[in-house]
A protein has these predicted regions:
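Binuclear metal-ion centers of metallo-dependent hydrolases, dominated by the metallo-beta-lactamase
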Residues: 177-191, 199-261
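DG-centered beta-turn motif at the end of beta-strands
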Residues: 173-175
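Conserved short-loop catalytic and cofactor-binding motifs
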Residues: 10, 149, 192, 220-221
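Binuclear metal-dependent hydrolase catalytic cores
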Residues: 1-171, 230-261
């Protein structure tokens, strides 16, 4: 498994970072996790082929995590992509996504490739092939908004993920809201990827000791919180400091050997 960070910014637009997107590659497919605003430009900047994406997985429907999707599909059409594209989304959001793409004038009949939208439930093991699967669990990132939807029209689903193949295992928190959301999965993994905007830095040291991942990679970094993250790292013990990395756009996890904030 290889992981490339296409977008490592927060919800606040930055000239230095694109919005959230992670590319997970195996020997058989490419999976894009989230596709925030500006993802198509991020593809060009990092020389990613629009035709190379086989699957897209959406963690939640905040704008910085999904609004780049229509533009990305448009670029795929313009380069005459032929291979199928499957978009994975929580079951509560499937109808919305179908309507969103329809209202973006992305009609299936006019695409050069087949677009499938597949819904899934939390806790289900979703197999991408014989050696790769993911499990999604719901976190509390969107819970604070429930008071604004008395008619319960929205699902308020924000997901964290566990990925595994024959070589590697990964936890990706997605956007979260509390320390508890860091522990939705308790598996020992090589790579623990966490957002860093909605959680205090001191909790990351606990992750390194309690869950003991080989590497902790922080993303979803705003221009404002970069300094506090660096200060946090500088105050860590040498043994822990060597295991924490700050992702920047283009960060290749498979070959990382130094922090690159």
């Amino acid at each position: 498994m290889k992981i490339k960070f296409l977008g490592t910014g927060s919800g606040q637009t930055s000239l230095k970072r694109s919005h959230s997107s992670i590319l997970i590659s195996s020997s058989k497919f490419n999976l894009l996790v989230d596709c925030g605003d500006g993802i198509s430009r991020a593809f060009l900047n990092q020389k990613i082929d629009f035709q190379s994406i086989d699957f897209i997985l959406i963690s939640h429907f905040h704008a910085d995590h999904f609004t780049g999707l229509p533009a990305l599909l448009t670029q795929m059409k313009l380069v005459s992509k032929k291979t199928n594209l499957t978009i994975f989304v929580h079951i509560s959001e499937k109808n919305f996504l179908e309507q969103f793409l329809f209202h973006s004038y992305l009609f299936k009949e006019r695409m050069t490739f087949e677009v499938k939208i597949i819904s899934f439930e939390t806790e289900s093991e979703i197999k991408m092939d014989n050696s790769f699967f993911f499990i999604a669990r719901r976190n509390s990132h969107l819970d604070k908004y429930k008071q604004y939807d008395p008619d319960k029209r929205l699902g308020f689903v924000s997901l964290s993920f566990f990925f595994r193949d024959d070589e590697n295992s990964v936890i990706y928190t997605g956007d979260i809201a509390s320390e508890k959301d860091l522990y939705l999965f308790d598996q020992k993994v090589e790579w623990f990827i966490s957002e860093s905007t909605h959680i205090e830095p001191q909790y990351f040291a606990d992750i390194l000791t309690k869950l003991n991942p080989d590497k902790l990679i922080l993303t979803h970094i705003s221009d404002e919180n970069k300094g506090s993250l660096l200060s946090f790292q500088q105050n860590m013990s040498k043994s822990l400091k060597s295991r924490i990395f700050f992702a920047s756009d283009g960060f290749d996890l498979k070959h990382c050997d130094t922090g690159c904030l």
